Structures are given as C-alpha cells and as structure tokens.
C-alpha cells in the first residue's frame, strides 16, 4: 500500500507529460497538488516542515533563476554583438559537419562545464548555442542532456562523490575504490551516450552509420583521460581534464578529417570557414568564466573564502531543514562575470543590452512558473521523512520495498534507483545522499560488494541527469520553447535506462 502511494507523484509525471503530452507548465501544478495532498493526509507532514521545505525550494529557485537568466542573457548579448557569427565561422573551420559540432559542444564542452560547475549550468550554455548553430530546439536539448551524463559522477569538482557519498558509511579506502570502479564502468558506457547523440541528430539515415567510428572516438577521447585521472588523482578533476582533452582531440580530429565521414552534413550551408585565430576575441568571456569556475572549485583557500559568504537559514523552524545561497560561488556569478567582460570587449550599446535583457526575461517566464512547482514537489518528497505518521520518507519507501522484493537481483535495479533520485531532485549529489546508504546496506544484506553498489548508485545518479525534470525545464527555458518536455523525458528516459542496465550487467560480469 505504502509503495503504491509513494509512486503516485512519479506515475502522475509520466502520465501527464509523456502519455497525455501536457506541457510542463500545466502538468507540474497538478503533480504538486497531488503530492501536497499525499504528504499532508497520509504522511502527515507538519505545517513547519511544509513552510521550511517551501522556503528551501524558494532559495534554490532564486539560484536556478539567476543561472538561467544570465545564461540566456549572455547568449543574447553574443547575438546582439554579432560575435555568434564569428564563433559559427570558426567552428566551420574545425568542421562544417553538424555531427562533429555536436560531439564538440554537446559532449566535450558540456563535460568540461559539468566538471567545473554542474548544477544545470552545462545545458544552460550548450542548448541555446546549439540552436544558434542550426540544431532544432528539441534535438539540441535532448543531445545536451545526453552529453551531460558520464561527466556528472565527478561533476562540480567531484561533489557527487565527496559530498554525496559522505553519509553512506564507507571508509576512505572504500570511497577511493568507488571512484576508480565508477570510472572504469563509465569508460565503455560513454559510447552509448555519444552514439545516442549521433542517432538523435541523424536518426535512421546513412549519416548515423558512417559516423559510428567518430562517435566511439569522441567517447574515448573523454573517458580514457577521465578514468586515468580518477585512478591517479581522485574525484575532483576527472571531468575537467577529460573535457579539456576531448575538446582538443575532437577539434583536431575534425580539423584533419580523422575518422570523419566523406559526406558532410550541415545545417547552415552559407557559413564560411575562417582562420581559427578569429575565434580568440569571442571566446575570451567564456574562457575567463571557465577558468574562474575551475580555479574556485579546486583552489581550497579561495573555495573556503567564497563559500563562507552565505545567505540562507539553518535548521529553520527547528525542522533540521537548511539551505544557503552562496552569491560569489554560485555559477550565476560567473555568467555575470562573463557578461561584464563581454559588454565592453564587444562594444555592446545600452539599447542592445536592454533589448537582450527584455528578450531573455520573455523567453524564460513560463518555464520559471513550471520550475516553482517542480522544486516544491521535489522538496516535499525529499523531506517527507519528517512526519508524525511514523513512516519512512517517500523515496526510502520505494527503495526499501524494491530491495525487499528483488533480493539478490536488486543489483540490476541499483543504478535505476540512483537515476530516480536525480530525476526527482535534479541533483546527482542529492540522489547519492538519499540512496547511497540504502545501496550499501542492501549490498551487505544480499552479499554483494558495498563499493560496487555505491559505484552503481553514482553511475545511475549521473545517468538520471539526462531526464531530470528540473534540468529539462531549465533547458526549455534557455532555448525558449513552451512545450515538448514530455518528448524530451521520454526519449532520454530510454537512453538513461539503457545506460543503467548496461552498467549493472558490466558490473556483474567484470567485478
């Protein structure tokens, strides 16, 4: 009975978005109301917990709103200044083939940004940029989200591992082994992601088959340095080093036609290639932003100083619920930094700035309404364990019930559970905090390695990023489309489940 009730919010999301194809701006308020009714009547959440979790959702909303607004505004400033045309021409000089461009942006660039910042930043940058290169909006979102998968395990300088596994009861040695095991499983699985990106933009044409070698090369250009970094340096740098390596290797391969198909597929036939030296000026704001993100995430002194400045609350209303906004550490601050550099560097006039700002607000307004209900629903589910009914929280009920039913076969569901956590919360780190201890406890019960189960949790929570509902809403906001969330979730759900099942099978066979 409890399991069926706990599944109601998830089933509703599936039915409303995927089966009935309602836009998220209509579907998510209904899911929110159903969840509110469920947690107040059956789980018996108190008013204090409702208020505290709502305020926590509010602070998270402010952070996401600023990330989305500044990302869209930065792209619009590039459009207003004409710099986007120079980037298009420079990319064409690497390769005019949109398949190569997809690997460069939706895979390698997204991985680098994920490694440095995480928190929805990669797709907020990549999706609108892909659209301006000619990619259809929905496809741009789908491939941007697929690309933001393998890198997520070590995203935001290793936060999903360092913070996410902190409550799993693992020793330091076990966490180190989890880092290595996760990377080794990801190593071949990344090919699923790059092949999926290629398939989305070419479908069943010859263009997909002839691009398979380059897709595999693109995956390995990231995962080989990523895995070596995880083995020798730990969880902070794999996605950053892998992303930089992939950008360089894919660019060189595209430029010198290594493994590229003879037939070139291009969305924009009229873009003329230019010398790569022309890309220097347009890239300066992006490079400064990326460098600042990498430095602030990996220089412990600066990291400590920036994160010490907080706006928020601790143990609100004596519920144990806390949240803080770190204004100089949040990714939105670095988007703002990039804009402050771009405006004088590109000579953007006040009229163009005002127009870009107005366009940006208009583009994201409906998605922001949706995001409010997504975050409220997620927080209510997350804190449903603080109740007067004596029940476990909604996510724990689901995890424990499935572990009880599946027994030793739970290992095949383990990464799917991690993906479910990310789908609800929008965060691999939070998914790991929610489920890693359950995964480890289940491993001990069924006689499986705790390290292996923790690794599958970390991998699954990364795969869940492909269809996490708040990531989908963020992506539709920055691209400016008002429907299609169900199609995006349906498509990426299939790829994420495939990724999860392949991870489980590989783990059983090799470890």
Question: Model-found features: residue ranges?
Answer:
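Hydrophobic core segments of alpha-helical transmembrane domains in multi-pass membrane transport
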Residues: 8-20, 31-41, 68-73, 110, ...
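Hydrophobic transmembrane alpha-helices that form the pore/transport pathway of multi-pass ion
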Residues: 101-209, 400, 409, 424-458
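Membrane-embedded alpha-helical segments and adjacent helix-loop junctions characteristic
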Residues: 51-59, 63-136, 142, 348-440
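Alpha-helical transmembrane segments
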Residues: 56-69, 176-192, 236-250, 286, ...
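Juxtamembrane and boundary regions of transmembrane helices in multi-pass small-molecule transporters
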Residues: 24, 153, 157-266, 459-511
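Hydrophobic transmembrane alpha-helices of multi-pass solute/ion transporters
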Residues: 1-73, 85-90, 94-95, 271-275, ...
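C-terminal transmembrane helix pair
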Residues: 180-195, 360-394, 398, 402-511
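Transmembrane helix-loop junctions in multi-pass membrane proteins
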Residues: 43-51, 83, 116, 158-175, ...
